[in-house]
Amino acid sequence: MIKSTTNPQEQRLPRPEDQSPAPPPPPPSSATTSTAAPATPTHQVATVIANMDTLKTAFLPNLSMDPNVHVSPHYCPMCHQQFERPQHVADHMQLCHGITLNAQGAIATLDGGHPQAQQHPKLSHPCFNCDEKFGNAVDLDEHHRLAHQTPAFLSRCLMCSIYGIHSATQQPNEYKCTQCGSICTTAMLAAGQQGFMEQQEAAVTPDDQLPAMAPRDMRLTPEEQHHQQQLQAEHHHQQQHQQQQQQQQQQQELLEQQQREMQEQAQQQQVHHHQQDQDLAGDQVALKVPPLTVKLNKNANGGAIVSHPQVIIKEEPLSLSDSGDVVNSVPVYAIQANPGVPAPASSGVLVGTQTVPADLAHKIRHKCPDCPKTFKTPGTLAMHRKIHTGEADATPKERPYTCSYCGKSFTQSNTLKQHTRIHTGEKPFRCGYCGRAFTVKDYLNKHLTTHTGEKPFHCGYCEKSFSVKDYLTKHIRTHTGEKPYTCPYCDKRFTQRSALTVHTTKLHPL
């Protein structure tokens, strides 16, 4: 039964007229509580409050303990919290401590003299950081401040669930990558975090995202922020490793594809040459020697003299082509009768030790060693080679393709296309080993031999080998003494065109 009247057992709150505005009395010490009567619920609450104040002093050393600051005449006897009005004290004690005050401002007691406390208050304020629940916001705030706002060395990492003491033992300015073992500085942490956040915004799958941030993440301590940056930077670094591995795999596949294409091209050329040799061997016919005419001349005595025409055999370097493709030059022997006896229109020619049918004679071409052009007669080839040696310039008819950037003319449209890439900067042929790009595919094939080490072109005079056929051609000239490039001013000859250019620039400037 609750007693509402004042009696000696009632514990009254101090009033303004009964006390001076001195600071509230401190809670009873441990020595006092040890010698006092059996602890009542009020004394137990006071003991808990005393321990809480000890925690405050330990974890918040900068908290002002001056009792003269913000002293109010109305305070809670349980926790010494100050209020402006007595009604606020009553509401506070009922909500926070479960103690009810009567109309006279005294603590309502039971028959046994113990203060009345609310049994089983409604726990409507859960903690977001643990499973605890509280009956009011004040207790929840006190719990959060003491239990979850402890120093950093006791806090729990929100990212990896490891207590923060592990971050204090590590180097604050560096972290080690688990993929490559490299150590990054704090300057790289900021860059890693920025790149990680950009990837998080562009990510479309939840697997690539970090765990969702809890409400308390907005109030991270500096140690927690530093540790979070480390994890984010490490995650970004691992993604960079994956991208690099994918790029290396793509480059390796590109290299393998280029090597397969080169091997297939070489095999096709070998098959083509072998098939051509078989066709020539299978279609050979007997050599048709021009018919010899016998002319009877009478001498002075009236006798007859038989006159035989003289057959002349001369050797010329020619090249054969069955389908318009130029092949390597082979020795071709052209049989020509004496000019006194005209040869028939259809005649055979001897190729090495074989004969070539007459219907293939018109396909015999003379290939220029400096460019892909071919000619029907050696004389036409000789006139054409003067263009390369500088003895004569090509006529406008021979250079119908003009560059729109510089006005330079070319004999072939493909050559103009390659030249135009010099002005546009286009290099569509890229090396898969080093990334170097070229304007012409032949240049790329020559460059690839520097990586593979392949030297398929061997010199017949010495043991040297070359990766490019042009290099072999220039080298052979050192053995044969051939100098196809002649200076148009002093008739001096050179083995290479570059040497002629240097000579003309220095000794014969325009």
From Swiss-Prot:
GO terms for cellular component: cytosol; nucleus. InterPro entries: C2H2-ZF_Transcription_Reg, Znf_C2H2_sf, Znf_C2H2_type. Keywords: DNA-binding, Metal-binding, Nucleus, Repeat, Transcription, Transcription regulation, Zinc, Zinc-finger. Residues 222-237 have a biased composition (Basic and acidic residues). Residues 1-10 have a biased composition (Polar residues). Isoform I is found in embryos, pupae and adult somatic tissue; isoform II occurs in embryos, pupae, ovaries, testis and to a lesser extent in adult somatic tissue. It is found in: Nucleus. Residues 30-40, 240-257 have a biased composition (Low complexity). Gene3D superfamilies: Classic Zinc Finger (3.30.160.60). Its main location: nucleus. GO terms for biological process: adult somatic muscle development; dorsal appendage formation; dorsal/ventral pattern formation; positive regulation of transcription by RNA polymerase II; positive regulation of transcription elongation by RNA polymerase II; regulation of DNA-templated transcription. Pfam families: zf-C2H2 (PF00096). SUPFAM superfamilies: beta-beta-alpha zinc fingers. This is Chorion transcription factor Cf2. One of its GO terms (molecular function) is DNA-binding transcription factor activity. A zinc finger (C2H2-type) spans 74-97, 125-148, 366-388, 401-423, 429-451, 457-479, 485-508. Transcriptional regulator; binds to the promoter region of Cp15. Also binds to its own promoter, thus having a probable autoregulatory role. The gene is Cf2. Residues 1-40, 222-279 are annotated as: Disordered.
